[in-house]
């Protein structure tokens, strides 16, 4: 798919750091930002799953979807962030702009299962896309045929609840 003429520029994929001290400083800065995001999620959430169970995750990804920062959360969620972001870049290539919020829980488009909802926000420096930040949270019920949305006898995904394809909010 060709990029529109007004598409934002995309920053380089990897930061080249040769000095181990500089690498550690960058690593800790990215981890610190991800941790601060996690603290903000806990302090603003009304969900007991988030506030008490910590069943959520935060992270920072490169414009190409590489995980570069991970917050204090569930490490198992980190594997879902890159494919969920790649689903957005597939559908919205060249059409992601400052202020966009992207949502997805579709297991066929990078999500893990319907109760895990991913939110991504692109981060720009001027007109250049430099990263995405992600907050992902487990939800107790997605409106499936049984409370909790996880019915073992389901024969199709639509019986499990609301399936959200990669969308802009």
PLM region descriptions:
Residues 2, 11-77, 82:
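Long, charge-dense accessory insertions within large macromolecular proteins
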Residues 39-47, 66-68, 73, 81-122:
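Conserved mixed alpha/beta core segments that line enzyme active sites in large multi-domain catalysts
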Residues 61-62, 120-124, 136:
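Core beta-strand residues in small-molecule sensory/regulatory alpha/beta domains
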Residues 76-88, 140-149:
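A short, polar/charged loop-to-alpha-helix boundary motif
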Residues 76-79, 118, 134-137:
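FAD-binding core of FAD-dependent oxidoreductases
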Residues 126-169:
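Mobile "lid/hinge" segments at catalytic clefts and subdomain interfaces of large enzymes
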